[in-house]
Amino acid sequence: MTRLLVVYFLISALLVGLDQWSKYLTVQNISLGETKEFIPGFLSLTHLRNTGAAWSLLEGKMIFFYVITVIVSVVIIYLLIKNYKKSIWYSVGLSFVLAGAIGNFIDRVRLGYVVDMLQTDFMNFPIFNVADSTLVVGVICIFIYLILDEKAAKEGKNGTN
């Protein structure tokens, strides 16, 4: 395994650690259902238990989430190992998506639900967590890679962004 590939897996591990640490702090310091102002007018912390996905979709379907998460994680690890030199955008994106999937998977296996805590005060949006955020950032990075790769292909380059 090359150093670069180790860096991408280290990124995932650090993000999983940050996610689990934030959930631990939430459970230890905020009662279930309680809200604490964090950044006034912007972000509050609300301790919730989510047995589904975003917006509580597929609530209670834990076996489904276990199977999908394992499959997705294996595919991402395979793609990262095979393509880690392809693009920093692509590889960082995969690392972030992997971290998000694993972070929420740990909660589901250990607790039977996912701990959510981040609540936007400036707009009505479902309460989420660090793992959810890393998933979104990862997908954005992969989209940037796809856009840059398509642009490079149109310009006749080899498409390595």
Curated annotation (Swiss-Prot):
Compartments, record wording: Cell membrane
Bilayer-crossing regions: 4-24, 61-81, 87-107, 127-147
InterPro entries: Peptidase_A8
Keywords: Aspartyl protease, Cell membrane, Hydrolase, Membrane, Protease, Transmembrane, Transmembrane helix
Topology of the protein relative to the lipid bilayer: Multi-pass membrane protein
Pathway: Protein modification; lipoprotein biosynthesis (signal peptide cleavage)
EC number: 3.4.23.36
Main enzyme class: hydrolase
Physiological role: This protein specifically catalyzes the removal of signal peptides from prolipoproteins.
Name this protein carries in UniProt: Lipoprotein signal peptidase
Gene that this sequence comes from: lspA
